[in-house]
Amino acid sequence: MVGMNIAVYAFSIVAARSLIPREFGALTALLGIILVGNVAALGLQVATARRIAVEPDRTNEIIGATTRLTLLIAASVGSAVALATFALTPLLKLESYWPVVLCGATLVPLTVMGAQSGIAQGTARWRSLTAIYLGNGIGRVIGGSAAIAIHPTVNSAMIGIAIGAWLPVLAGARLLALHSSVHGFVSRRGLVREAILGTHALLAYFVLSNMDSLIARNRFDVHDSGLYASGLILAKAALFFPQFVSVVVFPDLARANSHHARLRAVSLVAGFGMLAVAATAILPKVALILVGGNKYADMTSRLWLFALAGSALAVVHLLVFDALARHAHGIVILLWLAVATVAGCAYGLGVGITGLVVTIAAVSTILATIVWFAPAESRSPS
């Protein structure tokens, strides 16, 4: 997963350096739509991985049920996002309806990838999971970068991203058919219910973690939204890098009867975050090089705030996965309250670049603290 995140980060650098701030701001908002739309894939991944982890004797049947669901969910998500172009295009100040349609096209293979990842994760097939994640990162950096090199526009970048999104599906193609010949059967109802609950929580989280890119595109002028997007490169790096912890420890969190696994995981993610913030604060000019160079020089003194916001969101991400592993779906209420708080501050107080990133950092830190100290919910039967 680290390799995937490095590749995705590399694409962000290529895009920041190749596109003018106006175009890069639009691309960042579109990538935010993909991340939010990808919650169905993550919900399917979490539900599949958890079911296999707690019911290993029913692995064959669970994989069969997942396979039957995947194409339906993929087609539904892709179509819904594509149709949303009529609302999102004017909201994000885009010049064409096609970029959002291409977001929908990208989400079809990404949803299939989610099912494949859940099977690999639940069965501890780490090599297969690594191949899938690397395929996602390589597909993004090669497809997106090649498209930008041919024609440096948002439309071109999204075409490359949509094509590259099929590479991880090819890498994990055998997983969905792994046990399709087994005659055992498990009802899809329980899997669907768990996937919906997981998707709801992940939707709330990804709205929280991506809403600032959409707010910046909607509220700021196109130049300032591009500046904010450059800072988000660093925020996403701080957010995505430690996510391998959530993936690796999720089966342990699902089976654990104590909080030791949770404590170890949170400590590790928080430690990565502190290193990221310290490094950015001490070496801001080096960080500037990593987010696009001198044309974003106005952001130099504020980059550490983006590292802080991303690090806080990384801890929240882990705590969300911990809650899903424990079937503690009540966390979704706190996530939506956090979303409402950020939106209220952004639009009610009329914040600028600094105010928006500080709002994200503060709300995420408070949310992580509340979730950590909240009484643990009892596990539901699997």
Question: Model-predicted segments: where are they?
Answer:
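Signature of the first transmembrane helix
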Residues: 1-42, 82, 196-219
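Interfacial transmembrane-helix starts/ends
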Residues: 28, 58-72, 192, 257-271, ...
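Transmembrane helix-bundle signature of multi-pass secondary active exporters and lipid flippases
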Residues: 31-39, 228-247, 276, 306-313
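Membrane-interface junctions at transmembrane-helix termini in multi-pass inner-membrane proteins
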Residues: 51, 109-131, 255, 308-335
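Hydrophobic alpha-helical transmembrane segments
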Residues: 97-104, 130-178, 353-377
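Interhelical loop/hinge segments that connect adjacent transmembrane helices in multipass membrane
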Residues: 127-132, 154-161, 167-209, 380-382
